[in-house]
């Protein structure tokens, strides 16, 4: 944060801490430590608020732990949680559109908790083969990481309720997860999602080695991996 002697900066600090506290209490998330620092500014302009917190989670049975790498060709990939297409404050908006204004994604603590707890039920039942959260970079980034890690591709599709492909694949709406299930488990998985009032989209089908984004756009897993491992070198050489 900037200087706490500035009323606006102090207000940001108070609201951030209160917001984190409200969310942690609702989600029953155990925060064990945290840190902020003040007077981070150039002249009279403070940096963006960046509080840090540390939490603890418990895996009851490590044998049921799920990794993010895609496992098997022809398995089905779903997105848990609804994509509204929120682009403001996203990585895409900042880096591609060069837009830094606009509100962040809406926070819905009920959906956040419900979606997460339902995913845990699916994992505990043994239906999930791989899973990854959707955060910075949106669905396309989460799926790319799963492809690279599992050395598998995917035939992507977007739902009919969102016309804009950019918004669907790059939006950073909260409370979403990408999951992999096999065809035999699909009906059981969707029944549990429906029973718990969790929105989901069928995102695609896993293939051997390419990400098909649409009829005109595809990328190989080797190309994805090269982009992922060489970005820092390319950035530093500019």
Locate each region found by the language model:
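Glycine-/charge-enriched secondary-structure boundary and capping motifs
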Residues: 9-23, 27, 32, 36-52, ...
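Mobile "lid/hinge" segments at catalytic clefts and subdomain interfaces of large enzymes
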Residues: 1-4, 9, 21, 25-27, ...
């Amino acid at each position: 944060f900037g200087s706490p002697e500035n009323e606006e900066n102090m207000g940001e600090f108070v609201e951030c801490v209160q917001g984190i506290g409200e969310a942690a209490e609702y989600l029953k998330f155990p925060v064990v430590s945290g840190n902020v620092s003040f007077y981070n500014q150039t002249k009279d302009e403070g940096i963006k608020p960046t509080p840090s917190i540390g939490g603890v989670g418990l895996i009851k049975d490590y044998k049921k732990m799920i990794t993010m790498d895609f496992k098997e060709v022809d398995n089905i990939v779903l997105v848990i949680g609804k994509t509204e297409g929120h682009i403001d404050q996203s990585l895409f908006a900042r880096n591609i559109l060069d837009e830094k204004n606009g509100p962040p994604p809406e926070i819905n603590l009920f959906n956040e908790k419900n979606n997460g707890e339902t995913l845990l039920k699916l994992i505990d039942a043994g239906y999930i083969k791989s899973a990854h959260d959707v955060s910075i970079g949106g669905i396309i980034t989460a799926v790319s990481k799963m492809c690279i890690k599992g050395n598998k591709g995917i035939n992507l599709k977007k739902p009919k309720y969102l016309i804009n492909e950019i918004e669907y694949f790059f939006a950073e709406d909260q409370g979403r997860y990408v999951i992999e299930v096999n065809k035999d488990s699909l009906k059981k998985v969707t029944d549990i999602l429906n029973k718990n009032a969790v929105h989901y989209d069928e995102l695609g089908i896993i293939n051997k080695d390419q990400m098909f984004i649409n009829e005109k756009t595809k990328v190989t897993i080797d190309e994805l991996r090269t982009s992922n491992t060489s970005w820092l070198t390319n950035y530093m050489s500019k």
